[in-house]
């Protein structure tokens, strides 16, 4: 059995007493309009927010593979229809995870292939506050300067404050050549990855696995790589979903 498969089994069977800290790295953003992003998911470990996610089909949520690294002994669930993580909302529902499918080439020590598909225990109840997001299938780069939306429940300042309500920020896409400069990510950004500017506004810890949405279409997923949030020389890194269209389709089939 593949190591990721063993991990996924442990995730679904275990139940730990405490939750792991949120993974990933919205900084400098603002509170989102309630339920205006019905595709948003909170991937939770033992009842606490761990990572972002995006509903891509009635029974499937896309997130980041690295999110499971801290989850081997815990119970993973997915919260849909939420704006506030703690307050009661008619649209909120917590789903168990039937199957966790990390990309087969994902590895703990690299940001490449950092994708994870979570099959919900049943099809989500769709409505105005819960709806899948169309995702990009055409494998082409988003034009530099395009403003894209990132949303999540990740930390909102360098002191580590975690929001209860969904936050979002608009970020311009950065060209790959600039992102690969020695002073930035020094050649690490492959054609399967993309960058967005991070000058005091950025995705941050707890946002990993969340969506980068450009023109109403899912273009990228926040990676879990470790870096300083909001540093303009360390732009945000996102996995391009179009590069993995065949894999996503094969899992969802």
UniProtKB/Swiss-Prot annotation:
Residues 223-227 are annotated as: Self-inhibitor loop. Residues 21-25 form a propeptide. Residues 26-253 form the Peptidase S1 domain. Residues 1-20 form the signal peptide. One of its GO terms (cellular component) is extracellular exosome. Gene3D superfamilies: Trypsin-like serine proteases (2.40.10.10). It catalyses: Selective cleavage of Arg-|-Lys bond in complement factor B when in complex with complement subcomponent C3b or with cobra venom factor. Its EC number is 3.4.21.46. Disulfide bonds join 51-67, 148-214, 179-195, 204-229. The self-inhibition loop inihibits the serine protease activity in absence of factor B (CFB) substrate. Serine protease that initiates the alternative pathway of the complement system, a cascade of proteins that leads to phagocytosis and breakdown of pathogens and signaling that strengthens the adaptive immune system. In contrast to other complement pathways (classical, lectin and GZMK) that are directly activated by pathogens or antigen-antibody complexes, the alternative complement pathway is initiated by the spontaneous hydrolysis of complement C3. This is Complement factor D.
């Amino acid at each position: 059995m593949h190591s990721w498969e063993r991990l996924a089994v442990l995730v679904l069977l275990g139940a730990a007493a405490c939750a792991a800290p949120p993974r990933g790295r919205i900084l400098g953003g603002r509170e989102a309009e309630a339920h205006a992003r019905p595709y948003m998911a909170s991937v939770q470990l033992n009842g606490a927010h761990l990572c972002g996610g995006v509903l891509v089909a009635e029974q499937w949520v896309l997130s980041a593979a690295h999110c499971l690294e801290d989850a081997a002994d815990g119970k993973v669930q997915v919260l849909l229809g939420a704006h506030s993580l703690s307050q009661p909302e008619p649209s909120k529902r917590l789903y168990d995870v039937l199957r966790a499918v990390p990309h087969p080439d994902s590895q703990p020590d690299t940001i490449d292939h950092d994708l994870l598909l979570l099959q919900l225990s049943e099809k989500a109840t769709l409505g105005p506050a819960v709806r899948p997001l169309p995702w990009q299938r055409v494998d082409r780069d988003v034009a530099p300067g395009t403003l894209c939306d990132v949303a999540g429940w990740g930390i909102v300042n360098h002191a580590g404050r975690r929001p209860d309500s969904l936050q979002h920020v608009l970020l311009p896409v950065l060209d790959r050549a600039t992102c690969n400069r020695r002073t930035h990510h020094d050649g690490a950004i492959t054609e399967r990855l993309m960058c967005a500017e991070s000058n005091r506004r950025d995705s941050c810890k707890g946002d990993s696995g969340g969506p980068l949405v450009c023109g109403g279409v899912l273009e990228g997923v926040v990676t879990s790589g470790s870096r300083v949030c909001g540093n303009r020389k360390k732009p945000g890194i996102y996995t391009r979903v179009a590069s993995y269209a065949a894999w996503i389709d094969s899992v969802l089939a």
